């Protein structure tokens, strides 16, 4: 699935709402409690006596704040003095999403039923949302990069959750005066850091305790797997993806995927590529480095069926020369049949378990994969 991120937007209030969506610029209250965020680098939660402040750090300049939100109980009078930020009355009762990733978090919080609009509905598999789209309760807002403003106004969400994008603005939202919530979870480099953003989303629905419980379980499972991996010194080599046209995009060693591979006890062929983004390489350059690698991981999208070794070879004959192909050690995710992009960010423990089962099956005997399957077996 291709996830398209909505660009940075001008955040204003929703048409017809009260002054509760004004942006406050004073800090008369003192912080009563700083809620601990253990892994995520992109947000902070400050607890005050009468409100909660969410601070989203700028992913491209961590010394600066991208946006702040001040959450105030909708059933109480708005306090006279509030910390800096856009005021949102909670719990939020109507929400729209530009990405299925954020909707996946709300689903884990049992709040998918609050959805009134989504972008690119073909990427949503949650039955609550697909049924809502079918019966007209949820509006198809069009592409994430060009939202249908008229439909957005008609859907009347209190907030629109988006992924911020660097160096761009969306001025059409000035007309809508909608509270746009910028969730930058996709910029986190660690799997647990990305999953911890459920605490950020939960604050809008007053489900903080549930989010803490969910994340604690994920954290426990993930770290237990890491401890198992630490008991073995074997580090099989691995490379990822395949070429797109003439270009093969290779994830950096500091990337989200790179961290998964390290934690799963594999030696990523580009672990020394000191960046979190991807680099474009030619097939020849990838082949020269990865031809003898032990394993090959691929993500693809095919509604017709699962990829086979023969099918992979037919895509490009030279794929068959890789050692991992010859030894039938190619594992893949068919994103058309598994909700990897929708649910995977909130299931890093399951993704890690899949990878441990690939590289060190003796550590998880009898394990049944969730996302990654050998091409011989499919899912």
Positions of PLM-derived features:
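Bacterial Sec-exported substrate-binding components of ABC uptake systems
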Residues: 17-103, 210-238, 339, 358, ...
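Extracytoplasmic substrate-binding proteins
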Residues: 137, 148, 156-247, 271-272, ...
């Amino acid at each position: 699935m291709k996830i398209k991120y909505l660009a940075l937007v001008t955040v204003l209030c929703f048409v017809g709402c009260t002054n509760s969506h004004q942006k406050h610029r004073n800090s008369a209250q003192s912080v009563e409690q700083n809620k601990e965020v253990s892994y995520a680098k992109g947000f902070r939660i400050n607890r005050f006596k009468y409100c909660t402040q969410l601070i989203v750090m700028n992913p491209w300049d961590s010394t600066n704040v991208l946006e702040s939100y001040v959450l105030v109980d909708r059933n109480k009078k708005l306090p006279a003095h509030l910390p800096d930020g856009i005021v949102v009355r909670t719990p939020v009762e109507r929400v729209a999403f530009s990405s299925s990733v954020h909707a996946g978090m709300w689903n884990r919080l049992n709040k998918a039923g609050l959805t009134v609009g989504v972008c690119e509905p073909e990427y949503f598999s949650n039955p609550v949302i697909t049924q809502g789209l079918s019966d007209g309760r949820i509006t198809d807002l069009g592409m994430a990069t060009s939202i249908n403003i008229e439909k957005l106004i008609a859907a009347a969400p209190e907030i629109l959750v988006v992924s911020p994008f660097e160096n761009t603005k969306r001025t059409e939202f000035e007309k809508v005066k909608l509270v746009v919530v910028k969730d930058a979870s996709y910029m986190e480099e660690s799997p647990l850091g990305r999953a911890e953003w459920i605490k950020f989303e939960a604050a809008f629905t007053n489900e903080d305790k549930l989010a803490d419980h969910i994340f604690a379980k994920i954290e426990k499972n993930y770290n237990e797997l890491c401890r198992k991996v630490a008991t073995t010194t074997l580090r099989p080599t691995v490379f990822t993806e395949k070429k797109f046209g003439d270009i093969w995009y290779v994830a950096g060693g500091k990337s989200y995927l790179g961290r998964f591979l390290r934690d799963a006890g594999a030696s990523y062929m580009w672990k020394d590529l000191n960046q979190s983004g991807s680099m474009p390489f030619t097939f020849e350059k990838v082949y020269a480095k990865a031809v003898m690698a032990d394993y090959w991981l691929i993500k693809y999208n095919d509604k017709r069926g699962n990829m086979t070794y023969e099918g992979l070879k037919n895509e490009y004959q030279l794929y068959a020369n890789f050692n991992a192909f010859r030894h039938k050690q190619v594992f893949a995710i068919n994103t058309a049949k598994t909700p990897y992009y929708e649910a995977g960010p909130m299931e890093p423990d399951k993704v890690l378990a899949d990878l441990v089962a690939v590289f060190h099956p003796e550590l998880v005997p009898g394990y049944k994969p969730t996302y990654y399957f050998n091409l011989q077996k499919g899912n």
